[in-house]
């Protein structure tokens, strides 16, 4: 029950356990899958790491100068030189200065002067390449076991952790007591790593444009440089003052860390953990659940009394969680659970924790269920010790329909075409079709539920014809669009 504590939660239900199921996992969200005769599973991406990114360039933002040396010549005596000029670790500058009788020269005029100083970088930052094949995704899969300590648990101890990389995109997770689930995932970071550089400065990192980083007016070293001393463009952090006869002062600029922090305002900051860089993004995965099995399906039904350990309440997803305790004998056993209408004639709602079981007497069990909108009764156990609980779920199916549609529209606005992967239940939708299904699929399903596909096609044709014959331009365009969407969704649903 890991997903209970996460606000952004998707449900994938009604899928055959023997088929591939398409889901999309993103940071900050959780996906719950439910299939017939299969355990309910929660999937969450908890971490995306960039392993061993290659260094493109190092840039120095704080330096110091030592061992300053100056050599000068009188007019007409040639250009001065220093042996230190051959050392690439030094920064040097040639200048001209006024000379004459007052400073040791027999002639008046311009004499040469050269000054060198040892340049040492104290602090630097690195720009790193990140290749998609270096990304590692950590996924936690947690079955709905009903155990008390597993509700909303974020430690990873009660789920199975999987490491997904482009090199090992197909992996299997062994869930103790439930069998094996197979995952085939492909990363969708939404980033163009050819144009992006990871700028790492001390214990912080940012995503910046590659060309912006290369244009920084700071001393730099190639990423392949192993000596770390032969800085290029050292003069960008050094100022040579005006020379006076045989003397010239050279100073180094102060730390540029503050200027860099200001320049990076608004850039996407990347978190770091144990030297690895943590990314966002999402994974498109296909699940195969044919090797999964329900735990305790052969157990008999519990015949004793149950009691409510903690008052049940509605979660932020519209579901409810009930904590009960079995006081009877015969454990382990299955917990009888159903949701019925007020007349007690029809079974309603959906049990998310499939086949909840009691492993031992007096041990609390958590059950998650999705009751229908309005009034209903929750029945736990069998007579004579049966629990009958009244529940009122606020809202309506129409409101939920529009809420789901708005969620799909927001995803498309934020993520672009990558959002078309969300909400896929194994159907084949491509290009614009995925967008139409994502945004309008819920409304369409509610409006035309129970209508045959031929009638849907006919309605779409009629609406399109009316729009084409309308004299009002705005009405014509609106009706044609509605008709085309109706035709498309009608054809896709039938297919």
From Swiss-Prot:
Region: Fusion peptide, residue numbers: 98-111
SUPFAM superfamilies: E set domains (SSF81296), Viral glycoprotein, central and dimerisation domains (SSF56983)
Gene Ontology molecular-function annotations: protein dimerization activity
Residues in compartment: Extracellular: 1-445, 494-495
Coiled coil residues, start to end: none
Domain of life according to the entry: Viruses
Transmembrane segments: 446-466, 473-493
Cross-referenced Pfam families: Flavi_E_stem (PF21659), Flavi_glycop_C (PF02832), Flavi_glycoprot (PF00869)
Residues annotated as glycosylated: 67, 153
GO CC field: host cell endoplasmic reticulum membrane; membrane; viral envelope; viral nucleocapsid; virion membrane
Side of membrane Cytoplasmic, spans: 467-472
GO biological process, one term: virion attachment to host cell
Keywords annotated in UniProt: Clathrin-mediated endocytosis of virus by host, Cleavage on pair of basic residues, Disulfide bond, Fusion of virus membrane with host endosomal membrane, Fusion of virus membrane with host membrane, Glycoprotein, Host endoplasmic reticulum, Host membrane, Host-virus interaction, Inhibition of host innate immune response by virus, Membrane, Suppressor of RNA silencing, Transmembrane, Transmembrane helix, Viral attachment to host cell, Viral envelope protein, Viral immunoevasion, Viral nucleoprotein, Viral penetration into host cytoplasm, Virion, Virus endocytosis by host, Virus entry into host cell, Zinc
Cysteine pairs bridged by disulfides in the record: 3-30, 60-121, 74-105, 92-116, 185-285, 302-333
NCBIfam families associated with the record: flavi_E_stem
General remark: Isolate M3 comes from a patient with dengue fever.
Protein name as it appears in the record: Genome polyprotein
Source organism: Dengue virus type 2 (isolate Malaysia M3) (DENV-2)
């Amino acid at each position: 029950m890991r997903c209970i504590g996460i606000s952004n939660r998707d449900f994938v239900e009604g899928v055959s356990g023997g088929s591939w199921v398409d889901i999309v996992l993103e940071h900050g969200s959780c996906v719950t899958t439910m299939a017939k005769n299969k355990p309910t599973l929660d999937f969450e991406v908890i971490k995306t790491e960039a392993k061993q990114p290659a260094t493109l360039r190092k840039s120095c933002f704080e330096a110091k100068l030592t061992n300053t040396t100056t050599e000068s010549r009188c007019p007409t005596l040639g250009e001065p030189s220093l042996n230190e000029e051959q050392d690439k670790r030094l920064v040097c500058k040639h200048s001209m200065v006024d000379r004459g009788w007052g400073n040791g020269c027999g002639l008046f005029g311009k004499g040469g002067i050269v000054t060198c100083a040892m340049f040492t970088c104290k602090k630097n930052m690195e720009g790193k390449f990140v290749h998609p094949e270096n990304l590692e995704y950590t996924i936690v899969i947690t079955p709905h076991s009903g155990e008390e300590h597993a509700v909303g648990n974020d430690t990873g101890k009660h789920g199975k952790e999987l490491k997904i990389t482009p090199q090992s995109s197909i992996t299997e997770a062994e869930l103790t007591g439930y069998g094996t689930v197979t995952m085939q995932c492909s990363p969708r970071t939404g980033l163009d790593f050819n144009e992006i550089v990871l700028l790492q400065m001390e214990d912080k990192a940012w995503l910046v444009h590659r060309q912006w980083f290369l244009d920084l007016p700071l001393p730099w070293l190639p990423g392949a440089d192993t000596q770390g001393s032969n800085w290029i463009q050292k003069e960008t952090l050094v100022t040579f003052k005006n020379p006076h006869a045989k003397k010239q002062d050279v100073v180094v600029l102060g730390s540029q860390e503050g200027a860099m922090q200001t320049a990076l305002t608004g850039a996407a900051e990347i978190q770091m953990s144990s030297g690895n860089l943590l990314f966002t993004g999402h994974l498109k995965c296909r699940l195969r659940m044919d090797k999964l099995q329900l735990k305790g399906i052969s157990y008999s039904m519990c015949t004793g009394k149950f009691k409510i350990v903690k008052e049940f309440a509605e979660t932020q997803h519209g579901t409810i969680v009930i904590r009960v305790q079995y006081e009877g004998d015969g454990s382990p056993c299955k917990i009888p659970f159903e949701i019925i209408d007020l007349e007690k004639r029809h079974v309603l709602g959906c049990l998310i924790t499939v086949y909840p079981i009691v492993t031992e007497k007096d041990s609390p069990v958590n059950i998650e269920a999705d009751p229908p909108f309005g009034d209903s009764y929750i029945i736990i156990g069998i007579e004579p010790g049966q629990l009958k609980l009244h529940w009122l779920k606020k809202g309506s199916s129409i409101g939920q329909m529009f809420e789901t549609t708005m969620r799909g529209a927001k995803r498309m606005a934020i993520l672009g075409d990558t959002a078309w992967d969300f909400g896929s239940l194994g159907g084949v939708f491509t290009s614009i079709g995925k967008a139409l299904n994502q945004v309008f699929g819920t409304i369409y399903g509610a409006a035309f539920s129970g209508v045959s596909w031929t009638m849907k096609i006919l309605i779409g044709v009629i609406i399109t014809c009316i729009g084409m014959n309308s004299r009002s331009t705005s009405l014509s365009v609106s009706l044609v669009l509605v008709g085309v969407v109706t035709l498309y969704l009608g054809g896709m649903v039938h297919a």
